[in-house]
């Protein structure tokens, strides 16, 4: 009887330790720097997206949300929005003229059609990936919706600092993305119950070259489109 009781106590203790370890959540923090050509240094790094995926490839639960990218001043605001997959993004038109939001991304092409001031169109992003978005009327309008299959992500501050909160202890692959860095960057790391503090992580944008996108028909924008500025 004593052996059975002792074994049960040890089993209960092990289960308690495992439960506490599994529920332990920390914050992964660090800072991103952007390497650019002379004269092109960015002062705002809020377009940098950081996320963590379990190193073993385990699937994690995400919660879809509804968020907004406003069309104002012939710009997408914010220019970059990060969401969990299956989230809905609304595109309210706050300008005094019409817009036509579209994307040609293979896993999520869409076209809102032309709509006037005060109207809102929306799109649900079902698959993870980076979705460039444009306006078919205004050629300089470019934005991005970054859709992730993980709840562990953050958008950097102006100075490049980031903090991904609520990360369970374990091994992860850290991903960093910026639209001017073709390959992005990845880093494997172990997250303890208290999280992980990283140093400065450089992203190399020196190879970036601007290329004007085509309209939704795959054609060059007309001069009349440019005159709308």
What is the role of each PLM region?
Residues 2-12:
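Bacterial N-terminal signal peptides that target proteins for export
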Residues 19-21:
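N-terminal signal peptide c-region/cleavage motif recognized by signal peptidases
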Residues 25-229:
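Extracytoplasmic copper-binding redox domains, predominantly the cupredoxin/blue-copper superfamily
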Residues 13-17:
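Hydrophobic helical h-region of N-terminal Sec-dependent signal peptides
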Residues 1-2, 98:
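Intrinsically disordered, low-complexity peptide-like regions
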